[in-house]
């Protein structure tokens, strides 16, 4: 009898967690985007700080990331989606390089 109760409790917990995780996934999918995706000119200059704040949110070098991201955004009027990569979304942002040939924009 005790085994039956333990199996029932474990099954109930697994069933409950399955539904609670599904609700979280739905709410994440319906959340509004932090900034627009798109190519060059898809942002207005006043939208750059918020887009760069998100772009630089995962780096340990936050201050230089924000400086260069805002500089690039003000020139290109776009910031790639996500916190890393996706530079193909914004050719100007992707192709602007330093004198040494490295990427200027984070």
UniProtKB/Swiss-Prot annotation:
Gene Ontology CC, one term: extracellular region
Keyword terms: Disulfide bond, Gibberellin signaling pathway, Secreted, Signal
PTM statement from Swiss-Prot or TrEMBL: Six disulfide bonds may be present.
Swiss-Prot/TrEMBL GO biological process terms: gibberellic acid mediated signaling pathway
Subcellular localization, as worded in the UniProt entry: Secreted
Principal location: secreted
Signal peptide boundaries: 1-22
Family, similarity comment: Belongs to the GASA family.
Function: Gibberellin-regulated protein that may function in hormonal controlled steps of development such as seed germination, flowering and seed maturation.
Protein's name in the database: Gibberellin-regulated protein 12
